[in-house]
């Protein structure tokens, strides 16, 4: 099979934004769609478990040896833009901040909010990532996927995808996202779009601990409430377990103070859940995807 290159026993802490992770038995960073598909085929033919990571945000990987193939999509960065129609075709590994700035420079409106999301397009669709009432699903036309069981490649229209708050079926099925078609509003004022994009980024960096390793948001917001607000009301900001700490800037962020391991972080998540449930009667559901754990 052509274009199959991977490394062995790779430390995945280098590929997560929280800087924690175990070792991958096999690891590869495909440069394009063809290489990605070939890797999926190789894993299937060799009976290897296959897991996909993007930017590594919203991801907690246990400090264990992970058998099988781990694919990181961050080199899959192709973007094709039809400026007149607003249709944008992006590979799964395109970073949202990169896409946001490109859209603004092309006068395409509707992606300004994504500048503050430290994830890839594929990961963001899979997790249905968003900010307040916005999510990438709002702009989605279709997703191109490969089935890891049948190896069939297909295109799924948005109407056939059951998106929910911070959830998509891709979290549970065998379909891996290759690329997506998105629609943005053309003929926007470039100067205004760039200004809005920069304001959105500044708001994020002023209120969230971007200078330290973190997941992004740890918990989903409960109905008519905010996880960060609940955590702050209990005086938990700054609370630590090992090298893991609840951010003093934002209650819904856990930061790694250079030596945290996966147990520290999982224990801290559990303590937060217990305290909020005990004091507020609300169970906080993690937004973080967990690999290598029996959770929940």
UniProtKB/Swiss-Prot annotation:
GO CC aspect terms: cytosol
Matching InterPro entries: FAD-bd_PCMH, FAD-bd_PCMH-like_sf, FAD-bd_PCMH_sub1, FAD-bd_PCMH_sub2, MurB, MurB_C, MurB_C_sf, Oxid_FAD_bind_N
Sequence ranges assigned to domain FAD-binding PCMH-type in this UniProt record: 19-203
EC identifiers of the protein: 1.3.1.98
Catalyzed reactions: UDP-N-acetyl-alpha-D-muramate + NADP(+) = UDP-N-acetyl-3-O-(1-carboxyvinyl)-alpha-D-glucosamine + NADPH + H(+)
A molecular function (GO) term: UDP-N-acetylmuramate dehydrogenase activity
Keywords: Cell cycle, Cell division, Cell shape, Cell wall biogenesis/degradation, Cytoplasm, FAD, Flavoprotein, NADP, Oxidoreductase, Peptidoglycan synthesis
Compartment(s) of residence: Cytoplasm
Residues at the catalytic site: 166, 217 (proton donor), 287
Chief place where the protein resides: cytoplasm
Domain of life: Bacteria
GO BP of this protein: cell division; cell wall organization; peptidoglycan biosynthetic process; regulation of cell shape
Cofactor requirement: FAD
Pathway stated in the Swiss-Prot or TrEMBL entry: Cell wall biogenesis; peptidoglycan biosynthesis
Family the entry assigns: Belongs to the MurB family.
Record-linked NCBIfam families: murB, PRK13905.1
Purpose of the protein: Cell wall formation.
Protein name: UDP-N-acetylenolpyruvoylglucosamine reductase
Organism the protein comes from: Prochlorococcus marinus subsp. pastoris (strain CCMP1986 / NIES-2087 / MED4)
